[in-house]
Amino acid sequence: MAKEVWRFIDSGYCPPAFNMALDEALLDWHSEGKIPPTVRFYGWNPPTLSIGYFQKVEKEIDLEAVKRHGLGFVRRPTGGRGVLHDKELTYSVIVSESHPAMPKTVTEAYRVISQGILEGFRYLGLDAYFAVPKTEEEKADLRSPRSAVCFDAPSWYELVVEGRKIAGSAQTRQKGVILQHGSILLDLDEELLFSLFKYPNERVKERLQRDFKKKAVAINELTSRTVTIEEAKEAFYKGFEKGLNIVLEPYTLTAEERAYVEELARAKYESDEWNFKR
């Protein structure tokens, strides 16, 4: 049987508002039947702190530190916690909830989509596997995360190598369409990451940072040689094809599509109302 063809977009390094606007536009276009299911790869220029849809900026984020380090800042349309997007490959997958390969529940759909990432890690020679919380304590951690930092704990079907989280993802469902996007870390600047959040006191910050080192890891901490972004793209391109049993067909946005995304970025994702509303 012929494999299903999905669209593939590598949008390169883009401003934070554009990145979120393009993910939203792809969701909209797919819901309207204008485009097939899509896998997208992207990066961030400048490096950016993104926060989850429900996070409270004033309570959790040190905006002065974000400015001081010259970082971008944007609120995602998906849940989850704060992510520093810097030395990473960011991906998004846009597919209809009614797609025959998509299970009905969020966690099971998450597992199916993330199979593409799992295979990508294997192409890089890393033995990744899915973290499934077993104990009641681990399940409780998912319901009430200890910190505003995303990689603080593996969630359902998060990808783990040698017991440490290596890719963080979030999902939203709108208009009958699943949007899952996430970060595949090549390198991680923990000092910078932890300087961007507010803490009750320095002791709490130090403890969280110490715990974090035991729970999160980047690709280049695990490999004997440095994996480049181009190598990562190739591995995860093949990974998504294998994991989702699809063929990816590269696509470039038209001038009209790009203009639509830029307008959405300006009107919504660059606005204070969106980014600071909670």
UniProtKB/Swiss-Prot annotation:
Catalytic activity: octanoyl-[ACP] + L-lysyl-[protein] = N(6)-octanoyl-L-lysyl-[protein] + holo-[ACP] + H(+)
Residues carrying the site annotation Lowers pKa of active site Cys: K165
Residues of the active site: C150 (acyl-thioester intermediate)
Keywords: Acyltransferase, Transferase
Cysteines engaged in disulfide bonds, as pairs: none
Domain BPL/LPL catalytic: from-to ranges: 33-248
EC number: 2.3.1.181
Pathway: Protein modification; protein lipoylation via endogenous pathway; protein N(6)-(lipoyl)lysine from octanoyl-[acyl-carrier-protein]
HAMAP family, sorted: LipM
Function: Catalyzes the transfer of endogenously produced octanoic acid from octanoyl-acyl-carrier-protein onto the lipoyl domain of GcvH, an intermediate carrier during protein lipoylation.
Family (UniProt): Belongs to the octanoyltransferase LipM family.
Protein name, per record: Octanoyltransferase LipM
Organism phylogeny: Bacteria, Bacillati, Bacillota, Bacilli, Bacillales
Gene assigned in the entry: lipM
